[in-house]
């Protein structure tokens, strides 16, 4: 009554398996194959859905709180613009780049200088006292050398005068040694520049001499030839030839006339 049913299945959901998709040639056509049927050594043994796990719901500020914060900031800005409120300036620290720029302006290396040696960093309090900078100390500071400026200058006290007398010769010795070293380095630089300048002059002179010699060498053997030709022209044989040619150059009528007169 009923025909024989064919074997096999229709491929329902119960017959589907992602492991079979891995070996299928058309696996790229299956939706979600990169997560459910990963192929390759970079996907094996890794959690490919890590981005969807461990997320805690972050409760941000409500709309009313945001509006209140904006209004407060606008009110403070208005008061500062009208002059009713002082603006709080946050001090910015000196970064490494700024420190290097300051050292370059002073004319020294940043490694040789310290922060306490730079001018304009911080201010001394009133209790420290007045700092005296002599002419030599100022010169040393311009050269980028360390100057001891932490001693006080007070009118009274024998101990302070003795300490200052001890410190002065040290500073003077430092400045003298620094000046001498600076002069020596300048002299050496000048000598090197002079040597380089002399070498360059010698090279230029050699280069100028070479083309002059090259141009003068081919013209030298031609000169005696011209002199030889002139000497030949001045010889008596050449003079006779010239006379003969000059006589032959006369017109034929003149020649016949001369012959008739001779006859």
Curated annotation (Swiss-Prot):
Pfam families: MMtag. There is a cross-link at residues 22, 104, 113 (Glycyl lysine isopeptide (Lys-Gly) (interchain with G-Cter in SUMO2)). This is Multiple myeloma tumor-associated protein 2. The gene is MMTAG2. Residues 1-21, 105-132, 148-263 are annotated as: Disordered. The keyword Ligase does not apply. The keyword Ubl conjugation applies. Keywords: Isopeptide bond, Phosphoprotein, Ubl conjugation. Residues 105-116 have a biased composition (Basic and acidic residues). The modification Phosphothreonine is found at residues 215, 219. One of its GO terms (molecular function) is RNA binding. GO terms for cellular component: extracellular region; ficolin-1-rich granule lumen; secretory granule lumen. InterPro entries: MMTA2_N, MMTAG2-like. Residues 117-132 have a biased composition (Low complexity). Residues 1-11 have a biased composition (Gly residues). The lineage of its organism: Eukaryota, Metazoa, Chordata, Craniata, Vertebrata. It comes from the Eukaryota. Residues 183-209 have a biased composition (Basic residues). The modification Phosphoserine is found at residues 123, 127, 164, 216-217, 220.
């Amino acid at each position: 009554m009923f025909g024989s049913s064919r074997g096999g299945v229709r491929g329902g959901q119960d017959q589907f398996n992602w492991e079979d998709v891995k070996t299928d040639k058309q696996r790229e056509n299956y939706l979600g194959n990169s997560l459910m049927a990963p192929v390759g050594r970079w996907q094996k043994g890794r959690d490919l859905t890590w981005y969807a796990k461990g997320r805690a719901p972050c409760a941000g500020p409500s709309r009313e709180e945001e509006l209140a914060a904006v209004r407060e900031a606008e009110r403070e800005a208005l008061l500062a613009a009208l002059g009713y409120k002082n603006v709080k300036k946050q001090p910015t620290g000196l970064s490494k780049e700024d420190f290097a720029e300051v050292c370059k302006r002073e004319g020294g290396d940043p490694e040789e200088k310290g922060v306490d040696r730079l001018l304009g960093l911080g201010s001394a309090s009133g209790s420290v006292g007045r700092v005296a900078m002599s002419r030599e100390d100022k010169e040393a500071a311009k050269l980028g050398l360390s100057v001891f400026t932490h001693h006080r200058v007070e009118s009274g006290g024998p101990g302070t005068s003795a300490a200052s007398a001890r410190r002065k010769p040290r500073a003077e010795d430092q400045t003298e040694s620094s000046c001498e070293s600076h002069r020596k380095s300048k002299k050496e630089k000048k000598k090197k520049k002079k040597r380089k300048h002399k070498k360059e002059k010698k090279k230029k002179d050699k280069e100028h001499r070479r083309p002059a010699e090259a141009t003068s060498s081919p013209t030298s053997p031609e000169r005696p030839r011209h002199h030889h030709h002139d000497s030949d022209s001045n010889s008596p044989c050449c003079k006779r030839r010239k006379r003969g040619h000059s006589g032959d150059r006369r017109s034929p009528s003149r020649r016949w006339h001369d012959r008739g007169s001779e006859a």
